[in-house]
Amino acid sequence: MDLSPREKDKLLIFTAGLLAERRLARGLKLNYPEAVALISAALLEGARDGRSVAELMHYGTTLLSREQVMEGVPEMIPDIQVEATFPDGTKLVTVHQPIA
């Protein structure tokens, strides 16, 4: 399998996001990399599903709450930016204050 660097990055985000989902399902609080991976993976998948940038910007704020992450993590993530592939091309999705 010959993947481009971009494809490798997306695969890494997906894998880390899947791990974060499993840990969250077991009742564990997520750390910084896990929280970023979970939100990023969800945004990439949402773009693949055909959601708009505006929908994803809102959706990204609904994925995690303060109770689901370790102390201090929400303050470490003021925003998340993901370059996602949409049916009409690649666009930058920015989610401000993703963990409320």
UniProtKB/Swiss-Prot annotation:
Pfam assignment, any one: Urease_gamma
Location in the cell: Cytoplasm
InterPro entries, per the entry: Urease_gamma, Urease_gamma/gamma-beta_su, Urease_gamma_sf, Urease_subunit
EC number: 3.5.1.5
Catalytic activity: urea + 2 H2O + H(+) = hydrogencarbonate + 2 NH4(+)
Example GO BP: urea catabolic process
Signal peptide per UniProt: none
Biological or metabolic pathway of the protein: Nitrogen metabolism; urea degradation; CO(2) and NH(3) from urea (urease route): step 1/1
Alphabetized CDD domains for the sequence: Urease_gamma (cd00390)
Assigned GO CC terms: cytoplasm
Domain of life: Bacteria
Principal subcellular localization: cytoplasm
Listed Gene3D superfamilies: Urease, gamma-like subunit
Keywords annotated in UniProt: Cytoplasm, Hydrolase
GO MF annotations, alphabetized: nickel cation binding; urease activity
NCBIfam families (UniProt xref): PRK13241.1 (NF009712), urease_gam (TIGR00193)
Assembly information from the UniProt record: Heterotrimer of UreA (gamma), UreB (beta) and UreC (alpha) subunits. Three heterotrimers associate to form the active enzyme.
Membership in a protein family: Belongs to the urease gamma subunit family.
HAMAP family the record matches: Urease_gamma
Name of the molecule in the record: Urease subunit gamma
Taxonomic lineage: Bacteria, Pseudomonadati, Pseudomonadota, Gammaproteobacteria, Pseudomonadales
